[in-house]
């Protein structure tokens, strides 16, 4: 039996276009991943980042901060990849709080996101990463109706920066 969860799906809008238009600055992204380093402080002060680097690093920094805060209050399972993430919590109120907080963090940084929240099953089965000199094999095995419904809410066709609820979540608003 899989417990039902409120699942948040976050997607950065326009990320494919940024990836096509701008050079991937891996060194800058690696530096941004070490927030207290001298290089990271220099990068912040110089603000020479291209939009792809800025959006990617701001998204992941903000996402990590919001998840860390949420984990202090309740159980959270988060799966992040590229320009999107799924976050599962036990209660809709917690999921909505995460979505609102993330939107508050990202808007001033000009990182456009649309967020969908669904309610249903969620199971994180397996995560693995095998890195060798020749390459790597990475897998994130997770699934459930909460995953499908949160994605459906986000991609329902309504344009703009929004937090959208799937019908499955509406009955849990008072909880």
Put a short name on every predicted segment.
Residues 1-101, 108, 112:
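Catalytic NTP-binding/metal-coordinating core of nucleotidyl cyclase/transferase enzymes
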Residues 88-175:
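Catalytic beta-strand-to-alpha-helix segment of the class III nucleotidyl cyclase homology domain
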């Amino acid at each position: 039996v899989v417990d039902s969860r409120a699942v948040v799906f976050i997607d950065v809008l326009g990320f494919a276009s940024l990836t096509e238009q701008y050079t991937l600055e891996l060194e800058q992204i690696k530096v941004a991943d070490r927030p207290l380093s001298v290089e990271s402080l220099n990068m912040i002060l110089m603000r020479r980042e291209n939009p792809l680097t800025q959006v990617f690093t701001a998204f992941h920094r903000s996402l990590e901060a919001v998840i860390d805060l949420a984990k202090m209050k309740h159980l959270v399972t988060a799966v992040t990849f590229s320009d999107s993430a799924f976050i599962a919590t036990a209660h809709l109120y917690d999921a909505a709080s995460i979505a609102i907080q993330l939107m508050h963090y990202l808007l001033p940084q000009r990182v456009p996101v649309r967020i969908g929240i669904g309610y249903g099953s969620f199971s994180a089965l397996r995560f693995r990463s095998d890195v060798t000199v020749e390459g790597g094999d990475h897998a994130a095995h997770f699934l459930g109706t909460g995953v499908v419904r949160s994605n459906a809410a986000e991609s329902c066709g309504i344009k703009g920066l929004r937090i959208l609820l799937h019908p499955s979540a509406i009955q849990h608003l008072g909880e």
